[in-house]
Amino acid sequence: MKRKTAEVKGEKERNSKQISLEEDKIKGMFNPKIWDKTFQDGLKKEIEDSQPYNWGTIHELVNDDLLRAVRKEIETEIHFTKKETDIYRVNQSGDLANLSGLDWDDLSRLPNLFKLRQILYSKQYRDFFGYVTKAGKLSGSKTDMSINTYTKGCHLLTHDDVIGSRRISFILYLPDPDRKWKSHYGGGLRLFPSILPNVPHSDPSAKLVPQFNQIAFFKVLPGFSFHDVEEVKVDKHRLSIQGWYHIPQVGEEGYIPGEEEAWVRNNTSTLAQIESNVLEDFEFPKDERNILSFHEVKHFEKMLKGDAGAKTDNTPKESMTSVISDSVKLSEAEFTYLSQYISPEHLSSKGIEKLQKQFVENSSLQIESFLNDDKSELLKKVIKQKELEQECPYHSKDVKAPWKTAIPPHKARYLYIDGKEYRNFQTEADILEALNNNDLPNFQFTKDAIKIISDASGNSRENNFDAELALIDLAVFHKSTIFKKYLALLTSLCPVSEQILIRRFRPGMDFTLATKCRFNELLKSNPDIIDAVLEGTLCLTPSAGWESGELGGYELYMMDDDEDNKQYLKEDVEDASVYRADDSGDSVLINDPPAWNTFNLVLRDESVLEFVKYVSWSAKSSRWDVKMKWDVKSCDEDGQEDEA
């Protein structure tokens, strides 16, 4: 009996010793400092006090030889493919997009990478991480890592990492171990404060310049943990391993029944926020179109129905001549007015007939040399002058009237003029004031205000508003009843509402993410209103070199396949974020790079997504355009128009 007891005791001692040796081996692969209680408490305090939310970083995290070996394995054994969507451009490993999907029985190619994965998800390290971040217990069975390399032009736009059961996000950096990664290279991790929950500020308040063997991490905070990866600006590659720690799973220490389900149910991903109306109150400019007057709409209806000459009992015997003709052809006065801006070939009967045919066939138009030579040359001159002589503001607080900054930045960021009162959204109070005092667009008022500012500041280069004034004149032209009649002629659709924005997308800064069109709730009860939005984009970008797409800035329309996207969302949890726009090209309907003097017209229904791709730091100028949207009704008694 004693002998058997001694054998059992000896076996326990051997197992305990083996576990202890294994634990020592794991700890030995990390920097010894992280196991020191004083270091842990100091790091915990740093994280608690950090801004804009709780985050931390550790230099020289793991054994240097191990990480160098991992880097060598990745560079020699893994093939990377460039992937691009509306939110990112990055090089991902084709066979190792998610390390948890690897067949770990075959370790011959990547033994050191496997070892790194083991220690990062070891109980010892998870307990350390859970302690310093105050995240509690973390799952060791639900591993979630991906390998990315950021080369010149690569970027990842603002998001909060809220997907599924993620509890902590981390990035382990592996750039060249023998050279310092400098701030001007780009590729930094930038953290954004929040004006309100789910409404990040336009500008980051913290930036980490990554170095070899450095880890950055933060607790995933729905509505607050917004961050991005700055575009890499030089011909160097910034290798990194992105990963997440998840809520404990069934059978693991710290597992709480129903915790994960409640977390997923109560916390909305960035993508879901963009698609829903949850952000609607906090979006500026709002996707709202102002309803046109009865006076305007009646002319378009008469023209499209072909009853311009019809008389009613209320028709005066001596009818007055209207400034706006109801004829299906342009009057001499209308032709003269439109000729101030539009090229003559697009105003002739033959030119209009050609455009009408194209729109009927495609539900879209692309018109080159839309503006006449005089207006085109004037606009190019003042826009180039603006680019060359005036420094463009890159911080939202520095953006002055008449420009505003689009928010929130996990949906869009660009400069715009909307004909409304000047706003600069820095605080919750700024947003609430705008919501409480909503005004209608008045570009003439904006123009008058600019002249007052210009006169008060003098005619210096820094206060030259020639570009703004010329663009506002263009917006006034597009708002005119005669231009909308021309639009109705081209499309056989009757405009009933409108929105016009002058936009500037700055290099290294601006974009819009893919969204569906929103219909005007006030018009839903009208059965003649088409379930689509007519969108026009007059692109006025003065620089060249956009055709390849490498500089971004292109406007892209693509099909939104719900079933494909459900599968995409399911499969893509390994990516740093999840967004609909794929890079296969199969669903792309229209891809228009920035150009000079091109007018694109698209009838878009809710099955079509649209975005303007992030403009690269390498672009020679901003992307400039005038964006127009109209709700439209059909005057065809046989039925509605077909949408693209």
UniProtKB/Swiss-Prot annotation:
Residue stretches making up the Fe2OG dioxygenase domain: 141-247
Gene transcribed to yield this protein: TPA1
Binding site for Fe cation: H159, D161, H227
Family assignment from sequence similarity: Belongs to the TPA1 family.
Gene disruption: observed consequences: Decrease of translation termination efficacy and an increase in mRNAs half-lives and longer mRNA poly(A) tails.
Reactions catalysed, as given in the entry: [ribosomal protein uS12]-L-proline + 2-oxoglutarate + O2 = [ribosomal protein uS12]-(3S)-3-hydroxy-L-proline + succinate + CO2; [ribosomal protein uS12]-(3S)-3-hydroxy-L-proline + 2-oxoglutarate + O2 = [ribosomal protein uS12]-(3S)-3,4-dihydroxy-L-proline + succinate + CO2
Pfam families: 2OG-FeII_Oxy_4, Ofd1_CTDD
Ligand binding (2-oxoglutarate): Y173, R238
MF terms (GO), sorted A to Z: ferrous iron binding; L-ascorbic acid binding; peptidyl-proline dioxygenase activity; poly(A) binding
Database matches in SMART domains: P4Hc
Stated name of the protein: Prolyl 3,4-dihydroxylase TPA1
Cofactor names: Fe(2+); L-ascorbate
Phosphoserine sites (modified residues): S607
Note, other: Present with 8910 molecules/cell in log phase SD medium.
Domain of life: Eukaryota
Keyword Membrane appears in the UniProt entry: no
Cofactor note: Binds 1 Fe(2+) ion per subunit.
Gene3D superfamilies given in the database record: Oxoglutarate/iron-dependent oxygenase, C-terminal degradation domain, q2cbj1_9rhob like domain
Subunit structure: Monomer and homodimer. Interacts with FRK1, eRF1 (SUP1), eRF3 (SUP35) and polyadenylate-binding protein PAB1. Interacts with ETT1.
Entry keyword set: Dioxygenase, Iron, Metal-binding, Nucleus, Oxidoreductase, Phosphoprotein, Vitamin C
EC number(s) reported in the record: 1.14.11.-
Localisation per UniProt entry: Nucleus
